[in-house]
Amino acid sequence: GNIVTPGRDTISIDKTTLQNAPKRSTYVLMNKPVGYVCSRKQQGASPTIYDLLPHHMQHLKVAGRLDKDSQGLLLLTDDGDMIFRLTHPKFAKQKIYEVGLNKPLNETARRQIEAGVVLEDGKSAFEVTPLASRRLPNRYKVVMYEGRNRQIRRTFKALGYSVTHLERTKFGPYTLNQLTDHRYLHI
């Protein structure tokens, strides 16, 4: 038989050129722990999320990063179109977070956030609703459709609050409860 080199050789049957088989993309959901950075490059002594993945997944890119102090749902893939559809602001994908604050959020501050707080990179607005929990006071559900760098933390800080806990529980169609106790899961 003949040997074909993909990308160099073409195969034609009855003057019709066969197309290369579409590349199968990889999609992985990860439950990122606090303390890990979403970068391939080591940043000081902080471990990266890639330290949690096997060697054959090191090529995957992160859609919608989380900062070192945050935890929760990440999607890693080698599908650039998927990353674009999930992260570009024009697609307005829903993101849901559980946020802990250093003190109770008053109604005036809640309304300000929902109307929009002016930050150095523009207005930041999102929905904030209290989560009922005696065990974990000052917990809130945040729903947003954009995701600028440290936006939730900066928005609360502008109003005199500190974020003590930040966990993404939903990103587009994906939810953290799909992971149960796993660090990552192929989807």
Where are these predicted regions, by residue range?
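Basic, flexible Lys/Arg- and Gly-enriched helix-loop patches that mediate nucleic-acid binding at interfaces
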Residues: 1-187
